[in-house]
Amino acid sequence: LVTGVVYPLTRALFGQRLRQPLGREVVVSRGLAERLLADGAWRSDPSSATADLWVIAKAAAHDTRIAQVYLGPRTRPPPQPADVSQAVARVLGTVFQDMALHAPRWQRVRGSRPVPTFGEEHLPGEPNPPPAPGPLVSAFGLGWQDLRALWGAVLPPQTMLALQRVPRDPPEAFRMPDAVWARVVYDFAVGWHMKIMDREQLLRSMTPLYLGWVASFVNEVGGLGRPETEARVERLCEAFEAEKPYLISRWRWPDRFTP
């Protein structure tokens, strides 16, 4: 979720290249802490798993100086399939809420700039093996079969057609273009903002689309080293930035804007 959605989306929104917006460890200045305490939003769910993302969004939206520090690899168990839909709904719900809160700010931001980085990156000795693309593509196909009508209420016809044309056989040939994925994320953000349906239902319905993107990414970076993989992530982020005018237009004029 961080690589495919949270990082490229928050980078395009707020213009700061913070690689791990869900880094979990956050250090704040006294001034920022006072501003955060004055904001009553955190009191509604102070133990939220996405509280760190809320802090970072508040800082980025108010031009607070931000830096990132390498703390070393963290071993975490891979998410179970049953948890993916819940994670998508929880994380994207927080991101989309931050988008709504700070819309006047991010609509003025263009491009992005590097964030000061300290420390040395230490890669894990044995990274988790990538998931097999077959089950991911199958999940996307089932989503297309069962949720196509719902997706059509969120996505414009051009995007639906682009998704339909993505090859699924063999699974290793599955590729989701960066611009299409960026527009999918942006359109779901607009749909959440406009409350076109139950928000939880909308967010969970995005899971097969996300799994399709994961399959595409795995197919592209499988066998690549860390530098080449990060270069691929950079191209994805550039696509999100290039498609930001589309997001702004949809956000401002959701009813009369024709993609």
Where are these regions (language model features)?
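Acceptor/aglycone-binding surface of glycosyltransferases and processive sugar-polymer synthases
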Residues: 1-32
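Conserved, well-folded catalytic cores of nucleic-acid-processing
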Residues: 12-16, 39, 98, 102
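Residues that scaffold the ATP/ADP-binding catalytic core of kinase and kinase-like folds
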Residues: 35-36
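Conserved nucleotide-sugar donor-binding catalytic segment
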Residues: 40-46
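Catalytic donor-sugar/metal-binding loop of nucleotide-sugar-dependent glycosyltransferases
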Residues: 43, 54-72
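Acidic donor-binding loop at a coil-to-helix junction in glycosyltransferase catalytic cores
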Residues: 46-55, 87
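Active-site donor/metal-binding and catalytic loop motifs
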Residues: 69-85, 94-101, 111-114
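Terminal low-complexity segments of carbohydrate-biosynthetic enzymes
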Residues: 90-259
